[in-house]
Amino acid sequence: MNEQYSAMRSNVSMLGKLLGDTIKEALGEHILDRVETIRKLSKSSRAGNEAHRQELLSTLQNLSNDELLPVARAFSQFLNLTNVAEQYHSISPNGEAASNPEALAQLFTRLKDKKLSTKELQNAVSQLSIELVLTAHPTEITRRTLIHKLVEVNTCLSQLDHNDLADYERNKIMRRLRQLVAQSWHTDEIRKHRPSPIDEAKWGFAVVENSLWEGVPAFLREFNEQLENSIDYSLPAEAVPVRFTSWMGGDRDGNPNVTAEITRHVLLLSRWKACDLFTRDIQVLVSELSMTECTPELRARAGGDEVQEPYREIMKQLRSQLMSSQAYLEGRLKGERVLKPHDLLVNNEQLWEPLFACYQSLQACGMSIIANGQLLDTLRRVRCFGVPLVRIDVRQESTRHTEAIAELTRYLGLGDYESWSEADKQAFLIRELNSKRPLVPLKWEPSADTQEVLETCRVIAEAPQGSIAAYVISMARTPSDVLAVHLLLKEAGCPFALPVAPLFETLDDLNNADDVMTQLLNIDWYRGFIQGKQMVMIGYSDSAKDAGVMAASWAQYRAQDALIKTCEKAGVALTLFHGRGGSIGRGGAPAHAALLSQPPGSLKGGLRVTEQGEMIRFKFGLPEVTISSLALYTGAILEANLLPPPEPKKEWRALMDDLSDTSCKMYRGYVRENPEFVPYFRAATPELELGKLPLGSRPAKRKPNGGVESLRAIPWIFAWTQNRLMLPAWLGAGAGLQEAVKAGKQDQLEAMCRDWPFFSTRIAMLEMVFAKADLWLAEYYDQRLVDKSLWPLGQQLRDQLASDIKVVLTIANDAHLMEDLPWIAESIALRNVYTDPLNVLQAELLHRSRQQEQPDARVEQALMVTIAGVAAGMRNTG
């Protein structure tokens, strides 16, 4: 491990030196000296030198408006380069993630030691299902332009790791690194315009093209090797346990920019991109598959005896089919009237069948070494990505469906659906779902909002089957919320049964989730329609914002536990869909820990989880990182299903109920009930300024003028991460633990920490947040930005944080934070030296910006850069 630290530190200092040279060349010695002085003061301040801390503050406060931007950019870019070095070291030959695939082999050994039979292991592998849902959360601050350059920096670091480089080769790589660092410095890191939903979708396709396209088959190849060595099992060509879905272009919850027309466009664009990528694959196969020997069936398919190279012939036919489909889709995207080709690709079988026929023929003719090369990779891509490339989820808020149906019932003279009781709503919906006649009149002209809801359902109905994965209903509260969507889809003429997933996301809704699903499963029509399969989405970010992280995580656990048992009893296969964020206040946690901390049985129906904004780049930004992330997920799911965690003891559950109540009261006491809290929040964080950042296509608020409750979960977390108080990720949790310790429950808490993965993960997550939080910086924001009358509130919160840290260390039996994860502690320490000056500078800039009559472009731009820089330093935004 130490070897890895020193290798990483030397790369970090090399990249830092290259950045320094670039700054000196661009802006002269004076600015570089200024940056270097600040860096040294920051390092010394971190080591506890109080005089240097004061000097750091005065140096940053006294920067002229012309110096602000270069200094902010220097530290921000440095943190981006540090993240690249760290990502590289996590996958370098001796790094931690490089061993994830080997960890699978160790897992199989452990499973065998537990006396699990090879048959049981093979069954678990054959049922494996991982669906990762990419979302365009506005937290990916880094521009795509810069991401490409940073990816190439990673490639250079990997080339430098070869021991046998000649001097001229090393010089060539170093020259390229200099160019990349200079290009990044001379590129504006802040977007000038908000991305449109279509830009976001293109960003998602770029992740597929640049990373997943190579990463998924490479992972399956490694996984297959482990399986053959460990349990004598080979993955069949058609077994691809990994799939990707996207919310980009489908998630319209609170985002008026995502319309039915946008969804239609993104579906076409996605198919166009799939044609593009598969054409490249087939092009390679045309040159590779020059063999002449084949089975009689394949020869007939290729055109009979006169065809010399049957495999090539089939690949060429497929290539022309892909190209004509792509041309048709391009015409549609441009809005032209185009003739549909007779062999238009609409489903995966059209791609799979000819490719698999070639695969079987090569196997039959003794050429399996060729069959299992590039051709197998392409077959696996057909199974993973296929004709749609990524499927999309449509997400809409429950009240939009209620309002649409109410408008219809009023028009038809049936009364006002919105004012009916739940029982009356259900009776009406079930009657209409059973009815053979349409409900929506042809000549009806509804309001624009209702028209939009109906049009979205029509887009789903027209889309080729398999291109839409699910319809998610946010803020779902009642059975009628689910039935309403089924009725709207039926009215749109949807020819297939689309999974409709209620999303339970506030504390009350999580507590009622089991009741709602029990009622639904007792409805005969519903039981018949779902054919034994149900998806339910659990919301992490909104529940944490509503009740605090301790109460929310316990409500999520209990809801999942109850749903698993209810569905098991009803004989329904349940897929739990986890809406986790990247940050801990939004349910984020290292994948392995998060999955093993769920209730027993929660992964039987496979894993479906959102991968958000900035986390997509950290987990799937490079093919090698993709392999490592997928290996982690695979291992965790197999372990959770084959060695499920024990059911928590009764007294542990009772103690969690108490912790949850105490922590929720404390959290809401501040956030909802303290009249000073919202003014303090707005002053002490850059919340108002964040609204100006052109991050995502979605507005930061559900309602333009509401308080904290109307803020989306992401800006809420983002703002507190910036001022280093990290409040949403801990407030209330420590208070609950302190009460329990006072009540003499410390031994019990320690036992829970040792023996219950759910609880130990909660404690580990608190430690991680505490390690990133910083009391003196949070206090500095107060001094620079907050009215003196609100200072006592800030002091109270910081005192609470300090005592929370003590109680968590006591329960975990740790001498200091992150004792069990020295790699992460090292990484945070390394970054703090560069993040601290950005925080101090940000507080200064907020102070200047709020004092100005007229905004100064230099101050505004530098402020945006510090926000991006702190986000890079914290490794997550919202």
From Swiss-Prot:
Statement: the UniProt record of this protein carries the keyword Mitochondrion: no
Substrates-to-products reaction catalysed: oxaloacetate + phosphate = phosphoenolpyruvate + hydrogencarbonate
Essential cofactor(s): Mg(2+)
UniProt enzyme class: lyase
Keyword check for ATP-binding: no
Protein EC: 4.1.1.31
Pfam families according to UniProt: PEPcase
InterPro entries, sorted: PEP_COase, PEP_COase_bac/pln-type, PEP_COase_Lys_AS, PEPCASE_His_AS, Pyrv/PenolPyrv_kinase-like_dom
Entry GO terms, CC: cytosol
The entry's keywords: Carbon dioxide fixation, Lyase, Magnesium
Catalytic center residues: H137, K545
One biological process term in Gene Ontology: carbon fixation
An MF annotation (GO) of this entry: magnesium ion binding
Protein task: Forms oxaloacetate, a four-carbon dicarboxylic acid source for the tricarboxylic acid cycle.
Listed HAMAP family: PEPcase_type1
PANTHER family: PHOSPHOENOLPYRUVATE CARBOXYLASE
Family of the protein in this entry: Belongs to the PEPCase type 1 family.
Protein name: Phosphoenolpyruvate carboxylase
Originating organism: Serratia proteamaculans (strain 568)
UniProt lineage: Bacteria, Pseudomonadati, Pseudomonadota, Gammaproteobacteria, Enterobacterales
Gene encoding the protein: ppc
